Design a protein with these regions (language model features):
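N-terminal Rossmann-like NAD(P)+-binding domain of SDR-like oxidoreductases, especially those catalyzing
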Residues: 1-193
Length: 193
């Protein structure tokens, strides 16, 4: 392959990678690829929400360190991150459903905002090199009700609790990057996708 394929192929080899929400659909596919690329994967998630789940169907539990913890529990998240000191963190743990957010707005906001805040606070308090990628959603942008592809320069917003919580998660990530990581030599890179 070309140089880009070689670099990408080896970037996760023998690296410790934390994936929150690893039992969900996207998290399960991400873990599958990370294992294939040679990563040492640590997962933090609740029980899978479907039965059977992709996580179970792919037989991933035998290939990773699997924690079943609530992302809102700061002390548990802190212990896991301190113990494993991941070189990459992919944050996918979320309440991901728009319709559920109408029935459970408090849970939606607490999971999607405090989960992000908890991980970033651990990184702020403890010095080690890592890359943090916060997976949000195109729903984090203000809904213009037009046929339009959103881009990262669009205004954040949200007409429903889920969308608003994802916009807040983007703002929290940006705030931590600007306030604590941008001009420090702690070797923490932060981004959202």
């Amino acid at each position: 392959g070309d140089m880009n394929e070689i670099v990408f192929e080896n970037i996760f080899l023998d690296k410790t990678v934390l994936v929150t929400g690893h039992t969900g659909f996207i998290g399960s596919w991400l873990v599958t690829w990370l294992i294939y690329l040679g990563a040492k994967v640590v997962g933090i998630s609740l029980e899978p929400s479907t039965n059977p789940s992709l996580y179970e169907s792919n037989g991933l539990k035998d290939f990773i360190i699997d924690y079943r913890k609530d992302i809102r529990n700061y002390s548990e998240i802190e212990k896991i991150i301190q113990k494993h000191r991941p070189e990459f963190i992919f944050h996918l743990a979320a309440q991901p459903l728009v319709l559920r957010s109408y029935d459970e707005p408090m849970d939606t906001f607490s999971i999607n905002m405090m989960g992000t805040t908890n991980i970033l606070e651990v990184l702020r308090r403890f010095d080690f090199t890592t890359v943090f990628i916060n997976f949000t959603s195109d729903k984090c942008y203000e809904n213009k009700e037009i046929d339009y592809s959103y881009n990262e320069n669009d205004k954040l917003g949200g007409h429903d609790p889920y969308s608003a919580s994802k916009a807040c998660s983007e703002i929290i990530t940006h705030s931590f990057r600007k306030s604590f990581f941008e001009n420090k030599e702690n070797q923490i890179s932060i981004s959202t996708i």
